[in-house]
Amino acid sequence: MKKLTTIALVLVLVFTLAVSGAHADPEAMYGKTFPDFTVKTISGEDFTLSESLKTHDLVVINFWATWCGPCCMEFPYLQEAWEKYADRVDVIAMSIERTDTEKVLKSFAKEYGLTFSIGRDEKKLLDKMHGDAIPTTLIVDRTGKVVSVDVGAKMSVEEFTELFDSLLADIPVVI
């Protein structure tokens, strides 16, 4: 039964990536300045990209939805990696789903043990990048430039930590 469930999850992941990734173009953002934005988080606070970049070397912007299987599989790995790098890396996960209300998102965060910032993509930032695949993850450096774009889920903590290590390698630690 466990093997069948694993096979089913892999097939759902492959199908989702194949179908949703076909029209996505957020990769065009690589190397460009990401527009500043403010989003209300489920904790009631405002998350502003430019403010976060004043205290972090990198900001991870993750577009997702509660119904997205690959998104759900990726989150525990992102959470664990973020906990390790929280002093230098910030995370904002923005749901693109209109029905993902604050109550739904709070429940989801509790269920998955997520403690990084979570909000809704009410400004349709993913749409403005002509993206329609989730999860889509962009990483912005301290200058506001997009230094990484990934369409699809990361399936291990190591994928995140290796990426963070490579991006942080050339950034001096400010004490």
Q: What is the predicted function of each stretch?
A:
Residues 1-8:
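Bacterial N-terminal signal peptides that target proteins for export
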Residues 8-16:
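Bacterial N-terminal signal peptides
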Residues 15-36, 53-55:
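N-proximal helix/coil linker or "cap" segments that precede and/or mark the start of modular domains
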Residues 38-59:
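A short beta-strand-turn-helix
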Residues 56-59, 63-67, 133:
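Short pre-active-site segment immediately N-terminal to redox-active cysteine/selenocysteine motifs
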Residues 60-61, 91, 137:
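Hydrophobic beta-strand anchors of alpha/beta hydrolase catalytic cores
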Residues 72-112, 123-128:
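Structural microenvironment flanking redox-active thiols in thiol-disulfide oxidoreductases
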Residues 107-115, 120-168:
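Thiol/disulfide oxidoreductase modules built on the thioredoxin-like
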